[in-house]
Regions:
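Conserved functional loop/turn residues at catalytic and ligand-binding sites
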Residues: 29, 159, 202, 212, ...
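Fe-S ferredoxin-like electron-transfer domains
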Residues: 48-200, 213-232
Length: 585
């Protein structure tokens, strides 16, 4: 690798050719603040918070000092860089003041207060008052979506959301509109977000450094239900929530807080706190049964997983001709609600109309999913309210519960049994691996000793694997992120790729990187692979369990014995399966 000799703040360093000033400073252990920069996603130098002074060689001597944006400016041989002079600090402060001059400063009531990157930089640089007054850009609030709220009065035009939607997800429903001072981030033809092909994945939210984008807050609905003594209010927690909820309370990413999460939810007053891993296991049994039936009886292949509502809506918009390939299984969230309002309601003597079922999930698209058609096994919606990991964190704080001081507690019976296969649903490749653990045993007709299908693990955008099961070859593929889903499906259609079973998640890395997960600043996201760190919690949990196959879950067996009959039965299809819409563009 070619190396360059440079100086940073008077010290000599050697850095790889092609490095930016920001890369070089980071390798030297020097932090340069950024605001618009997201590594590999948004590298445009727009906010100018990362200003530094550089001198470049002009023949045998250094040229004059000038200011450049560190995030995009490449280093050159002999370059001298100054990262924190008084002139630089004042320039950064001035840029922050200019941003604030056109910004809604209702910080006390903003969802992003204390996690806002603009707020932190203003504190760091001593921005105490606004020296610039005058006209502000005309903005409005788009609250048409059931998942995502857009408030352009808090937008700083960093374009991180635009890059996440276009560059990372290859959807591009939002972009810069108008020119000059009137520029805002908007949709094509200024449509309401709900009327676009937005898939509600929420990657724009986790990319946003301010409160310009956030999930629709449904915490008041939950508290209202909890206060209604005529209602039976239950909650279930998705696999990945336990691996991220601690981040809301200062724990390092990658900390498993399942026990404290359960304890906190119980103290909020839910009648039952249940583990969604159980219906992840149930999903696997139904989905693998469906796959085997399609393979044996000439059904539509490849079959594609249906757990991710963002992916489902993407398919309905962009690949409507492939909706027949989708598994008809409801997601684990919807299956749980269906089981609660049919089997459990009957067992307890509850009227389904008196049950409020809440799901704690990492996903903003789940808010859209609860209102989808054909998701009402008992004649009422399977799930009433979906709250993100962030909303759960806010509910716990609002209730005055000291999360860190809580003891570890267990999920409530009878929905407390789950396998490691259900746990790994939260990571890309997890659904595929869980399904293979079941399908392989059915095809082989014997107990599977090796349950780790490591070929489908990892954060690579697209993964392929072929398994030879006593002469039966099963070809599988895994993709996460809609951009990668598009590439995979186009390859399947053209014949470039071949697979019988495909797992697709809308969010890159899967649910652990969902749009409803705790905020992490760009400084963390640019240096830590949060997807891998969070997924490791789930894989460690799986590896530590004796029960690692969905089909061996006693809770799932009991559901079939007492209520559903057999996997793929008529009753199972009535309660656990759904249909899709060809939305088109």
């Amino acid at each position: 690798m070619d190396m360059l000799n440079i100086k940073i703040n008077g010290r000599e360093y050697r850095v790889p050719k092609g490095s930016t000033v920001l890369d070089a400073a980071k390798s030297a252990g020097i932090d340069i603040p950024t605001l618009c920069y997201l590594k590999d996603i948004n590298e445009i130098g727009a906010c100018r918070i990362c200003l530094v002074e550089v001198q470049e060689m002009r023949g045998p001597v250094l040229g004059p000092a000038r200011m450049v944006t560190a995030c995009v400016y490449p280093v050159t041989e002999g370059m001298s860089i100054v990262t924190n002079s008084e002139k630089i600090k004042q320039s950064r402060k001035l840029n922050l003041e200019l941003l604030l001059s056109n910004h809604n400063k209702e910080c006390l009531s903003c969802q992003r207060s204390t996690t806002c990157e603009l707020q932190k930089l203003c504190l760091d640089y001593g921005v105490e008052e606004n020296h610039f007054t005058g006209r502000k850009t005309a903005t409005d609030i788009d609250d048409s979506s059931v998942s995502i709220i857009r408030d352009n009065s808090k937008c700083i035009l960093c374009r991180r959301c635009v890059a996440a939607c276009k560059n990372m997800q290859d959807i591009g429903v939002i972009g810069a509109v108008n020119r000059g001072f009137d520029t805002v981030i908007g949709t094509t033809f200024d449509k309401d977000l709900a009327l676009t092909t937005c898939v509600n994945c929420g990657q724009c939210i986790v990319a946003c450094p301010t409160g310009a984008l956030h999930e629709r807050d449904d915490t008041d609905k939950v508290f209202k239900a909890l206060d209604d003594k005529s209602k039976h209010v239950f909650i279930c927690a998705a696999p990945s929530v336990r691996a991220q909820i601690g981040e809301c309370f200062g724990y390092e990413p990658g900390t498993d807080c399942e026990g404290k999460m359960v304890a906190a939810l119980k103290r909020l007053g839910f009648e039952g706190v249940y583990d969604m891993n159980l219906t992840a296991d149930l999903t696997i049994v139904e989905e693998a049964t469906e796959l085997i039936d399609r393979i044996k009886n000439g059904g539509t292949l490849p079959m594609i997983t249906s757990c991710s509502p963002g992916w489902i809506k993407y398919c309905e918009h962009y690949f409507p001709e492939m909706t027949e390939n989708l598994s008809t299984c409801k997601s684990p969230q919807q299956m749980f609600g269906a089981v609660i309002k049919t089997y459990f309601a009957e067992k307890m003597g509850y009227d389904p109309k008196d049950i409020v079922f809440v799901s704690a999930i990492p996903c903003t698209a789940k808010k859209f999913e609860v209102g989808r058609p054909n998701q009402s096994a008992a004649g009422v919606p399977d799930v009433d309210i979906a709250v993100t990991t962030r909303e759960v964190g806010r509910m716990i704080e609002r209730a005055g519960i000291n999360f860190k001081s809580l003891p570890d507690e267990k999920f409530d019976s009878p929905f407390d049994v789950s396998s490691g296969a259900g746990v790994i649903f939260g990571a890309t490749g997890g659904v595929m691996e869980a399904a293979l653990r079941y399908a392989a045993e059915i095809i082989l007709g014997k107990k599977l000793e090796k349950v780790d299908f490591t070929e489908v693990r990892g954060t690579e955008p697209i993964k392929f694997a072929t398994y030879d099961l006593d002469g039966t070859k099963v070809k599988v593929a895994v993709a996460s992120g809609t951009k990668n889903a598009k590439k995979l499906l186009n390859g399947i259609k053209s014949g470039e790729y071949e697979a019988q079973f495909i797992e697709i998640m809308a969010c890159p890395g899967g649910c652990v990187n969902g749009g409803g997960q705790p905020y992490q600043p760009a400084a963390v996201k640019n240096s830590v692979d949060l997807r891998a760190v969070r997924a490791k919690v789930l894989y460690n949990d799986d590896a530590s369990r004796d029960l690692r196959k969905s089909q061996e879950n006693s809770g799932v067996k009991k559901l079939y014995d007492e209520f559903l009959g057999a996997p793929g039965s008529h009753k199972a299809h009535e309660v656990l399966h759904t249909s899709y819409i060809k939305r088109g563009m």
